[in-house]
C-alpha cells in the first residue's frame, strides 16, 4: 500500500516556542525548518510513501520543502486563524482525496528530525490493517502519526492529550517497538537531546551544532 502523507508546518516565526530554553528567538525558525526538512526528506525516502503534501502558509518552508520533492499547499483560505493544526490536516487530506479518492492518507508531524524511512514504512504497514490507526509520541500523551485507510476519513484530533482523543475516536493505537524515530517529536530541549541521541538528519545536525546543548 502506497500512502500519501500530510505534514502541517506552521509559520516558522511562530514555531517551537517551547525551545526557548535551548534556542534563541532568532535561531528557532531555522531549527524548525531543519526539523521539517529532515522529516520530509526521510518520509519521501520511505518505500511505503507515494508522496508528501505539506500544508503551510510560510513561503520559505513551502519553497524549501517543495525543493525536496513535496507538494506544498496553503492552508484553507476559508479557515479562521483559530482553526489551527487539525483544520490544516483536514484540508490537506481533502486535497489528496480529491485527486486520489482511494488513497490511504496519514498525518505526520513535521518535527521528527531523527525519522528513519524503514521505521516509518513499518508503522505504515501496521496501520494498513485498520480503518484508522495512530502512533503515540515518545512522551506517551500525544500523537506523531494518524493514518486512514481508503474509504475512511482522517478525523484528526491533534494537540495536547491527543493520544486519548484519537483512541476515543475509534482509531487503533499501534503497539510497536523499535520505531523510536517515528515517535520522537521535538517540542522541548529534552526532546531535542533525545532526538540527537537517536541520530538526526543532516539539516538538524548542522543547526543543532550551533547550539550549546548540555549532554551533547
UniProtKB/Swiss-Prot annotation:
Q: Which residues bind phosphoenolpyruvate?
A: 143, 159, 162
* Keyword Iron assigned: no
Q: Which GO terms describe its molecular function?
A: GTP binding; phospholactate guanylyltransferase activity
Q: In which pathway does it act?
A: Cofactor biosynthesis; coenzyme F420 biosynthesis
Q: What class of enzyme is it?
A: transferase
Q: Which Pfam families match?
A: NTP_transf_3
Q: Under which EC number(s) is this enzyme classified?
A: 2.7.7.105
A biological process (GO) of this protein is:
F420-0 metabolic process
Q: Which UniProt keywords apply?
A: GTP-binding, Nucleotide-binding, Nucleotidyltransferase, Transferase
Q: What does this protein do?
A: Guanylyltransferase that catalyzes the activation of phosphoenolpyruvate (PEP) as enolpyruvoyl-2-diphospho-5'-guanosine, via the condensation of PEP with GTP. It is involved in the biosynthesis of coenzyme F420, a hydride carrier cofactor.
Q: Which HAMAP family match?
A: CofC
For this protein, the record's PANTHER family field holds: 2-PHOSPHO-L-LACTATE GUANYLYLTRANSFERASE
Instruction: List the protein's name.
Output: Phosphoenolpyruvate guanylyltransferase
Q: List the taxonomic lineage.
A: Bacteria, Bacillati, Actinomycetota, Actinomycetes, Kitasatosporales
Gene name per UniProt? fbiD
